[in-house]
């Protein structure tokens, strides 16, 4: 079993994710190999909250160029976490 801190990579701070905070939903970039159960357990253990549901989406990397060299941004996985009423993640307070 992997460490919980290896599953949750970083929070997503965008206008859309900040609007979801009103609905008690939090957005994170997570490990591509993680499933919903692992993500739920990681959030509950790291932030000590109760998770109601987890929605995930795979995001393909955009193609990029550096002069004549072509490449692409890495693929990633995003998770939208819905918490049970009365629970909040303090990391997002004041944003």
From Swiss-Prot:
A GO CC term assigned to this protein in UniProt: ribosome
The organism's place on the tree of life at top rank: Bacteria
Keywords: Ribonucleoprotein, Ribosomal protein, RNA-binding, rRNA-binding
Keyword Ribosomal protein annotated: yes
Gene3D superfamilies documented for this protein: 3.30.70.330
Family annotation (InterPro entries): Nucleotide-bd_a/b_plait_sf, Ribosomal_uL23-like, Ribosomal_uL23/eL15/eS24_sf
Pfam families from the UniProt entry: Ribosomal_L23
GO molecular function: rRNA binding; structural constituent of ribosome
Annotated GO biological process: translation
Assembly and interaction partners: Part of the 50S ribosomal subunit. Contacts protein L29, and trigger factor when it is bound to the ribosome.
PANTHER family in UniProt: 60S RIBOSOMAL PROTEIN L23A (PTHR11620)
Family named by the database record: Belongs to the universal ribosomal protein uL23 family.
Described purpose of this protein according to its UniProt entry: One of the early assembly proteins it binds 23S rRNA. One of the proteins that surrounds the polypeptide exit tunnel on the outside of the ribosome. Forms the main docking site for trigger factor binding to the ribosome.
Protein name, as recorded: Large ribosomal subunit protein uL23
């Amino acid at each position: 079993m992997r460490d919980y801190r290896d599953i949750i990579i970083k929070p997503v701070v965008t206008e859309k994710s900040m609007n979801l905070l009103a609905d008690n939903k939090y957005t994170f970039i997570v490990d591509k190999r993680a499933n919903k159960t692992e993500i739920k357990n990681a959030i509950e253990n790291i932030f000590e909250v109760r998770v109601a549901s987890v929605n995930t989406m795979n995001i393909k990397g955009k193609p990029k160029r550096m002069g004549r060299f072509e490449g692409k941004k890495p693929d990633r996985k995003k998770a939208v976490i819905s918490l049970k009423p009365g629970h909040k993640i303090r990391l997002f307070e004041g944003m």
